Structures are given as structure tokens and as C-alpha cells.
Amino acid sequence: LNCELNEVLNNLDVCAKQISEKYNCVTVLKSHKTVVTSLNGEIYHNTTGNSALAKAGSGDVLAGMISGLIAQGMSIFDASVLGVYLHGLAGDLAKNDLSAYGVLASDTIRYIPLSIKNYLCKNINVF
């Protein structure tokens, strides 16, 4: 994008769209307010997650979640949206039990089943 970090942080939607257009891809732009953009301009603003996810390995957990959803037949955009939501929810649940300071990526993994259960039981629509 050839711009400064502050420009990206202040323009997440625009920057994510530019990446999707430039590279013809779905973009997951991680931040304190994660944004997912599609090839045709759809934008999803994630509502879950917290500072507990700002740890080494957290992005790897997210990538694995998105990949697993794609492997189950979801579109890349839908898998990215749901993966980001569930990953953030797992982080929220872990933070509630362990504190933001004590959560490791491995803890987030342990909370994924509970985040899926909450998503299914509460009939949440992220799409």
C-alpha cells in the first residue's frame, strides 16, 4: 500500500479493500477492530476479541480456524468472517477466565469448542 501504519489504522476499510482489489483476494486485516473484505467489496467488521489475542501464535490459530472452515466447504469470505468471529469469541471467553495478561495462543485453542457452542446456541448471525 506504500503508506504509514497510522494511515492503515485510521482507514482499515479503505486499506483492506485496496489489498483485496490489488491482489484479488479476501483480506483479513487484524487490528483492535478486525476487518474482512471480499473480492466484490463486501466488508465485515468483527465485534469479538480483545487484547488477550495480541500474543505470539494468535494469528496462527486464526489462520488454522479459517483454513479448517474452508476445508469444510465454506467460501473463503464466509470462512474468514466466521473464523475471525469465533477466534475473537474464544479470546473473550479465555480472557474472562484467565485475564488478558494470562492468555496464550494455546489457551485460545482450548476455548474454540466453547465459542462454537455459544455461536450455535445463541443463534448469532454474523453474515
Residue ranges and their predicted role:
Residues 1-45, 121, 127:
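Glycine-rich phosphate/dinucleotide-binding loop and adjoining beta-alpha-beta core of small-molecule
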Residues 3-12, 73-78, 99-103:
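Short, charged, surface-exposed loops that flank catalytic or proteolytic processing sites
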Residues 12-20, 76-90, 105-113:
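Short, well-structured alpha-helical segments that form the helix of a local strand-helix-strand
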Residues 33-34, 50-52, 84-90:
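Acidic, glycine-rich active-site loops and adjacent beta-strand->loop/helix elements
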Residues 44-56:
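Short pre-catalytic strand/loop immediately N-terminal to key active-site residues, enriched for Gly-Thr
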Residues 44-46, 63, 87-91:
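Short acidic (Asp/Glu) and glycine-rich catalytic loops that position anionic groups and cofactors
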Residues 55-86:
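Short, small-residue alpha-helix embedded
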Residues 91-127:
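Charged C-terminal helix
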